[in-house]
Amino acid sequence: MSENREIDATDRRDKTFDKEKLRPHVYSSVAGGMRSTSGDTKAVLLFSLLFALLSYIDAFLYVLGDMVMMNTQMPSSILFIKSVLVLPMTFFFIVIVQKGLRYLSQPRMLEVILIISSVFFLLFGFVIWPYCKRLQPDFFWSRDIFSDGKMKTRHLDFFFPIFLVFSEWASTMLYLVAELWGSLIISFMFFSRAIHQCTEAQVKKFLPTISLISAVVFLSSGLLTKSLNSRRDALPYHEKERLFSQVFIVTSALTVMSAITSFFTDRALAKDDPRHKGKKEHKVRKIGFAGSLKMMQKSRFLRAMTESVVAASVCSNIFEAIYRGGIVLGAVQSSTSKSSYMNRLNAMAQIITSIFLLVMFFKPATHLIERRGWFPVAITAPIVAIITLVLFFPMVFFNNITEGDLIASGEEYVGSFVLENYTGMFLTTIIRISKYCFFDVAKEAASIRVSPVHRHSFRGIHDGLGINIGKTIGSVYCTLVTVVFDVRDVRNVVSVSTVFVGVFCVIWIRSILHINKKYKESIERNDFINVELAEG
């Protein structure tokens, strides 16, 4: 009987390999089982190490990018970078990678990009940043143009953050790299490579470790940032600049280590299973923008999924923009340099995030869905957004009204902007956590109950299209509102933003209610969700 089971298992495996045009392999039951187990464990460990290295670089680049932007530019400059520069740079990067994949495998392409990034970090730390005063226009060039309200009288004051983006191009370049690292290097290249190379069993073992790895990375990065920030504050200017360059040496070394880890991961997987040597090409039917809109018109469920993703992205982007707008004022009140103050806030945010991720690793939201149902998990993020709207925005509005008095009054009012900053940091961090740990998990649970016929195309629309539309709406709104009201910061029109965000919170909740209705129906019928493609 056992021999028959082994033969049946081998036949099934061989048929699968024939279907995928791969060479079949027959293993003995004992040796094959041991090899499979050790191979899966090795793959999970290697990919976990690679993910940890890439995530640590991402966490540190986030801190460095914020630090240099606060030191040389202003929060509204970040909005311009996100709304105007990030998207074309993303498309350019993707096109380069796609062309490179014609000649290189996914692992080799990732390693080439990591080596190029390592060289960039060295150049930035030793050439671009130390000599940026000689390479860039004079520090006071754009500041003189907009000083003393000269452009305010011409209703052109909103151009000031844009001028800073191009005159302070060194900090803009670093912020762009920091912004693109997480979305392109990790999300686009690493995860597509992991899914491409790993078996289904290896992916199932690897995915639960992501939360734990991210928690450890954020905790260690937050503690290190806090420690370096304290040391940096006690140093003279030239020593601070030297320490900054040394940080880029470490970042470059970590990037090289990531490339080496990637290389050995590929070699180890190929050695354990020769099937990984060949590249599999899967043709996926692509749906354009017009096709996505037509499908959303037909399916109310898909429209609700996309609306919820767009609303979540818009709310989180605007909350963060308004929070960042008050950091400069908080630094002035606390008599701290802007970069040091920003580092302190980022370090605390990373530590808070790590604590929540550790809790969620041991008490995942998937268990809450099984116990409490889908709706309580999905509604957590919009409730946190509404709480932030009610608590944080009035605080910003009051501080805007009394801004001149608060800055001039000295010790009597010290703490109002600082309190706003720490409240904003905590609430935006909680929004981010609730979005990733609750809303995204609930969205994935609903997506899994969609028929496999539509699942891939639906996910491409509500995740791929929805997230990009949400980010674009948030960034473009923040940029346009400064133009319309002729202000330098979106924080100055928080009353308008309250209404705008409130509308998207309502859209978010309404979409969740519809998804919950369809999810419940599918559970009761013990069938896939009715996506209503035949309707409308």
From Swiss-Prot:
Name of the encoding gene: NTT4
Family per record: Belongs to the ADP/ATP translocase tlc family.
Single annotated GO MF: ATP binding
Transmembrane region(s): 44-64, 77-97, 109-129, 172-194, 205-225, 244-264, 309-329, 349-369, 378-398, 465-485, 493-513
Keyword Nucleotide-binding assigned: yes
Membrane topology label: Multi-pass membrane protein
Pfam families linked: TLC
Name this protein carries in UniProt: ADP,ATP carrier protein 4
Functional note: ATP transporter involved in the uptake of ATP from the host cell cytoplasm. Provides the microsporidian cell with host ATP in exchange for ADP. This is an obligate exchange system. This energy acquiring activity is an important component of microsporidian parasitism.
Signal peptide: none
Subcellular location: Cell membrane
Gene Ontology CC: one annotated term: plasma membrane
Main location: membrane
Entry keyword Glycoprotein: yes
UniProt organism field: Encephalitozoon cuniculi (strain GB-M1)
InterPro entries assigned to the protein according to its UniProt record, in alphabetical order: ADP_ATP_car_bac_type
